[in-house]
């Protein structure tokens, strides 16, 4: 059975901070998902704001899902840094009924101002390292629409290889097996990631104060 870590944990890399998806993030997330291009790229359906709040709650309560909002560190400032610096989200799902140690990865960089800066790559790598260390994941998958060339290129550069193609959904499935060498590399990456814990409901408190744990 998968056990959840404390939800009030944020992961800070060189260019991004991954913070838990909270209710305060929903209005901006909902605004992003009015973009038809993002809906197509993520294979999502448009939701009302009320439905978006319900979805956020269900995601945070699902023991087989981890969802983090990606913050662009260039914009982390002020009391609402965890909202103002929002640039996308990154998720892993343990939804393989035959093997709970297989996780599907998703990444979205929604803000045009933050694209082309390597934030997607860093976010995925941190999330994979998190999954290997805390959830004992031994294989990652990614399902990407064939027209989403940017995501396909990103995951292939990270070492994912095509395992199947759905002509019906026009979707490519990629896989990344965590070998011993890859595990060591991912865990080493975590040496450069700062884990913040925050006692309040505002991740900005710990980010701006420098509160962190090893």
Kindly label every feature range from the protein language model.
Residues 124, 141-142, 165:
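Residue-level detector of family-conserved "landmark" positions at structurally sensitive sites
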